[in-house]
């Protein structure tokens, strides 16, 4: 049970068979992932293509900021081997300018599919999530 996903800043290779990944148990849908990416881009954080480790640290911070550490959001950092995923939403690969450049799920045959255009409903959800996150940020900044 959950809405799980893995988010990676780079894909495994022969030279580097394991890469760091962010695991989200809740809010792992494309709408939430892209909304978090939008926040990172707006804040002008270095992107995953130019500095993967920095980008990962910043993204974890944004997840905590908007969904709250105390709210048991089930967020973690793990290793990704290029073959496994956590089910539900699969794996998102981030690239330059905080864009989702690949999105895939592993089946028994590990078949990948490219992330395509969002539907209007996905765009609407993304905007609603982003608006919620902005309100959360305003509350945090308003605290004495």
Regions found by a protein language model. Name each.
Residues 1-5, 18, 86-88:
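Short, surface-exposed coil-to-beta transition loops
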Residues 15-54:
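Short, flexible N-terminal segments of the mature chain
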